[in-house]
Curated annotation (Swiss-Prot):
Name of the protein this chain belongs to: Putative 4-hydroxy-4-methyl-2-oxoglutarate aldolase
Cofactor(s) in the UniProt record: a divalent metal cation
Biological process annotations from GO: regulation of RNA metabolic process
Organism of provenance: Cupriavidus taiwanensis (strain DSM 17343 / BCRC 17206 / CCUG 44338 / CIP 107171 / LMG 19424 / R1) (Ralstonia taiwanensis (strain LMG 19424))
Binding of substrate, residues: 80-83, 102
Catalyzed reactions: 4-hydroxy-4-methyl-2-oxoglutarate = 2 pyruvate; oxaloacetate + H(+) = pyruvate + CO2
Organismal lineage: Bacteria, Pseudomonadati, Pseudomonadota, Betaproteobacteria, Burkholderiales
Length: 165
């Protein structure tokens, strides 16, 4: 699916007004080979520790988008080239990170879409700390497990359920 976030916003102004469709703040940079992607959200809440990110990406993605609330940390990366390849191999369509990624050249050849705040060369800690399948606060929007994520070059949308055009 190739989302067109502008068309979805225009077609669902009522949902924007009632809050069942939300727009993330325009603070994310694009990485990965896919400029547009969509799917149901799997969520993680971590801080400078990507142990749970790896464990989640090792599981079947089944067309989902991994939404990682990394607390907006700009001090280390939560996703790198190896995890990008793992996500692609296991059927994840995309990753949205409220934090940093690294190995951008490697990620840019992965056949998934990735959005993150920035690139950072330092890897994260590995303490096995974090929460999965919880409600997370991303820049500008709350994301709950199972919400639908729509991403393209114009932005990131979060819908309570799958949108029809």
């Amino acid at each position: 699916m190739k989302p067109v976030t502008t068309d979805l916003c225009d077609a669902h102004e009522d949902r924007l007004a009632e809050g069942t469709l939300r727009v993330m703040a325009p603070v994310f940079r694009a990485f990965g080979k896919q400029p547009a992607f969509a799917g149901p959200a799997a969520t993680l809440k971590v801080f400078e520790d990507n142990s749970l990110v790896r464990a989640t990406l090792e599981s079947p993605g089944r067309g989902r988008v991994l939404v990682i609330d990394g607390g907006g940390s700009l001090r280390c990366a939560l996703v790198g080239g190896n995890l990008g390849l793992l996500a692609e191999k296991n059927g994840w369509v995309g990753i949205v990170v409220n934090g940093c990624i690294r190995d951008t050249a490697e990620l840019d050849v992965c056949d998934i879409g990735i959005r993150a705040l920035a690139a950072h060369p330092q890897k994260s800690q590995k303490r096995n700390v974090g929460e999965s399948e919880v409600t997370v606060q991303m820049p500008g929007a709350v994301v709950r497990p199972g919400n639908w994520i729509y991403v393209d070059v114009d932005g990131i949308l979060v819908a309570d359920d799958k949108l029809e055009r």
